[in-house]
Amino acid sequence: MNKFSLLVLIGFLFAGCKTAVLTEVPLSTLNMDNQAKTAILNIEVPGCSSYEDSRQESKALIDLKLKIPQVFNGAQFKECYKVKMDSVASFVIPVYFGKNVLETEIQGAELKIGKDQNNNLLVTATRGLRDKIENFQKQSISKFDFFVMFKIINDTGAEVKNLIAESAFIDDAPTYYIDFNMPKDSSVVIRLNDVATNILTQKGDNNGVALILRLPKN
């Protein structure tokens, strides 16, 4: 599987540790055939190595290597490394996107990104994934928060006008129903609000579908 171009940042606070999944995908790829790509899930851990024996993996890392594949189908451990003073456990998880991905039944697909018939850019999470996230949260010692961010990249070769973001954070600034344009080769980061995030991460009586933004009508 290859990396995809609409950046998806899915983050957790796992037992108080910051976690993020990052993948980039240009707008042009939303019109491609349905396909699976990989997102990078990075989780902050107390340390990669055991304090007693640096040749051994830490208990926190061992625990994550067991639990993350139980939450995300197809998740694979990649590496554990240090960034300045922080230790990060990195995984890859599959995400599916494409021009017909939302209405197509794909075996094993838990996370999807695509456009509906009204050109709304949506992200969906299956009931099975939401159940696993909620169960994982209940098993965690401290609060388990989930946030989702998207880096939209305009690689269409022209300015894209009249995109609409509803009640979201744009480049980390809170906004409500903002209409904006994207110059050629520009990018913008959108983070879902709490309500949309809960739709993707809690069982509830919802369909697991959240709006990212409204694209201009063709």
Where does each model-flagged region fall?
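Sec-dependent signal peptide recognition
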Residues: N2-V8
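C-terminal motif of bacterial Sec signal peptides marking the signal peptidase cleavage site
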Residues: A15-G16
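N-terminal Sec/ER secretory leader and immediately downstream segment
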Residues: A20-L22, P26-S87
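Mature, soluble, non-transmembrane domains
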Residues: P69-N218
